[in-house]
Amino acid sequence: MNNLEAILRLKTIDAAKKLLGHFLVSKYNNKILIGKIVETEAYLYNDPACHSYSNRTKRNSMMYAQAGTSYVYFTYGMHYCFNVVTADVGIGEAILIRALEPIAGIEQMQLNRSKTKLMDLCSGPAKLTQALNINLKDNGINLLDKDSSILLRYNNDLINEIDIVQTQRIGISKAKDMPYRFYIKDNIFVSKK
């Protein structure tokens, strides 16, 4: 078991904190695009804001896969959101990746987003999926497999617990008071402070 696999087997809230600082990698157009995870939100099976709360559907079926599987969904008729499945198979929990700090492949990210401002490339769930060219083709990918087109990469430079801000989730209408959003303090690439 690698370190990322161990993180994703933690309780989802703990995993959402521990994923901060690690890398999301996209292999696109013969380029490697890398972003450091700087903001996450946890979604639990008993959480009214979680897609698996009511029941299993075709759309949310990947939430029930093994930890480390990608769960990508289309929202508002125009955006994709990228999640990392956590917990045991059949539970239905995931972590929404809300923001990344661009690390490598920045020129391609700028082309993908039609934006040049670095701070605006990946500072939100829809922005980062556009920058890394993540869409429904990436739903159900094993993010722990080094040969996957989208994967998680471990960062040995771990984030200290005192540098993690915990707050309410944003951009949702149900259970928005739950303190399940986490971000790296003072990081300029976070979507909202």
Curated annotation (Swiss-Prot):
GO terms for molecular function: alkylbase DNA N-glycosylase activity; DNA binding. This is Putative 3-methyladenine DNA glycosylase. Its EC number is 3.2.2.-. It comes from Francisella tularensis subsp. tularensis (strain SCHU S4 / Schu 4). InterPro entries: Formyl_transferase-like_C_sf, MPG, MPG_sf. It is an enzyme of class 3 (hydrolase). The keyword DNA-binding does not apply. Pfam families: Pur_DNA_glyco. GO terms for biological process: base-excision repair. The keyword Transcription does not apply. It comes from the Bacteria. NCBIfam families: 3mg, PRK00802.1-3. Keywords: DNA damage, DNA repair, Hydrolase. Belongs to the DNA glycosylase MPG family.
